[in-house]
Amino acid sequence: IYVNYSSNAQQPGVEQLRNELNYQNPLSLSGGNPDLKQSNMHSVYIGYTAAKTEKSRTFSLNFNGSVTAREIATKQVFFTEDTPLPEYNGYIAPKGATLTTPVNVNGAGSMRLGAGYSLPVKALDITFSANAGCAYSRRPTYIGDELNYTNSLSPNLSLSLIGNKSLVYQFSLYTNTAYNRTSNSRKSDNNTINQTVATNLTVNIVKKIYVTANYNYSLYHNFSYADGDVNTHILNLTFG
């Protein structure tokens, strides 16, 4: 069992802390925030691995997560009329201008749980492996002057077969399926799925002459669109 904890602090930049307004472009203003605090991220990782060397079997389980306090985000305010800014010596922001400033936000975090298993199938001279995981993240951001929280959930599963029959043939088969669901405070959802399949086969026809075939397939589907599928097929053959 392996356990690790770490902490990281991010200090605001000097420009971010200056109580000054950049008005070189009167319609695109930017200013500092002297009340900005440093952000602190706390991370933890826990891993477990078990192996049976006599049977060449392995099992692993891991978890990692992090939370961030006072993350530094960018806030943007749009002015619908001429507006004085007392925090910047009373400068009057003209109608139609935007003001961009850094601010601290809370609520950022992420976590992931994963597991893996591998074992040989001696009767077929192949090794089977499976890996599964699920990740979740929550990220606060500003859309204009409105604080928005984006949540993302991403489970995935991958399987593989690897075979090696001495000098006769070598082959591998790999497949991965990943689903992603993203939602935010504005009730807009986005759901996608990615599927990939990759296979490789090398056969020794006669002495020192080999045929190698590689096939790759990928599928991307966006559930938000009726015609959101993207399919790709690639086949390569080599002789040597």
Regions picked out by a protein language model, each given a short descriptive name:
Residues I1-G240:
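Exposed, low-structure sequence patches enriched in small/polar residues
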